[in-house]
Amino acid sequence: MERLVERLASAETRGDAILLLGVTAAFAELFAACRGHGRAFRLGPASRVVDTGGAKGLARPLSRAAFLRECWTLLGVPGYYCVNEYGMTELCSQRYDSALDDRFHGRGLAPRRLVAPPWLRTRVLDPDTLAPVKEGDAGLLCHHDLANAGSVSVVLTEDIGRAVAPAGIEVLGRAPGAPPRGCGMLLADVLAP
């Protein structure tokens, strides 16, 4: 983290725009390091943040709103320039937060949602019956990815979410009793003594 903080300071001094990509849990570590050093940055105005993996494995939960607040407070990157990615090893395609696209297309007040390329569809299913839920209700996320031509094209997850218009989803968490999964969990392994 020390080297990253030094590089952020250097980028800030030069006014460089940077792209920070990482698992959400690593950003939580960066935020803690910034606070520990009493340091906040004002990165170049074209700087962007892309995070993935959610807050799994964190000792202290970090909500999406808190994450966006920390990006602004500690990095100087506004929330509309922070993009969340949702994907998994089993899928060839990913979903991305709509905020940046919404901003550039004049939809600034549209609800944040995870949008996908046209070949990826997600259905929201009742956990007990696997029937589709009513519009707006939460359920298990079932992804149909046509890019998975060489393997299975349908992946039923233990992620709970809901459909969000237009053409998006919101991930709410994991099904009760489902083990945590994802790249955010790897950081805990890396940081373990």
Predicted regions span which residues?
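Active-site glycine/GP-rich loop and adjacent strand/helix microenvironment
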Residues: 1-193
